[in-house]
Amino acid sequence: MPQQLALMRGVPFVLQTAATATGNGIVVAIPPGFKNHTFHVTGSAGIASGVVTLEHASDPLYAGTWAQVAAPVTPLASTDLVTLATGVYNFVRARISTIVVGGTVTVTVTSD
């Protein structure tokens, strides 16, 4: 198994960087004591469409359908959208489920 990245309390972790294409992004492990999670979905100028789905699973290599942390997020141009989630998650990712058109999207998560 490849090396697994884990969050540090209160330190933002980038799950997607200036992304446009559909894909899972980076999977990060959440330490068991971290229950409050803040996801920032930041759209660049010019975004016309796209969807980011915030997901979690019990295994970083899980090949099935990951569970949604919250409702899918439609990034907006030059805007930082915040999604708050509470729960015990083993692994999270920010999957671009619909291609981003006209700009890029960056997604970060911070947990404690």
Regions found by a protein language model. Give the residues of each.
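Short, intrinsically disordered N-terminal pre-domain segments
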Residues: M1-L15, T106-D112
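Surface-exposed ligand/attachment interfaces on beta-rich extracellular proteins
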Residues: L15-P32, S44-T53, P72-V82, V100-T104
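A generic structural motif
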Residues: T42, E55-A57, S97, T110
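Short, surface-exposed beta-strand/strand-loop-strand elements in extracellular ectodomains
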Residues: I47-A63, V107-T108
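Noncatalytic modules at the cell exterior or secretory-pathway interfaces
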Residues: F34-V41, A85-T104
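Surface-exposed loop/edge segments in extracytoplasmic proteins
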Residues: V11-Q16, L61-A71
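Intrinsic-disorder/low-complexity, polar/charged segments enriched in Ser/Thr/Lys/Arg/Asp/Glu/Gln
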Residues: M8-V14, G25, N36-T38
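Extracellular and organelle-lumenal recognition/adhesion modules and their flexible linkers in secreted
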Residues: P2-L5, V28, P32-K35
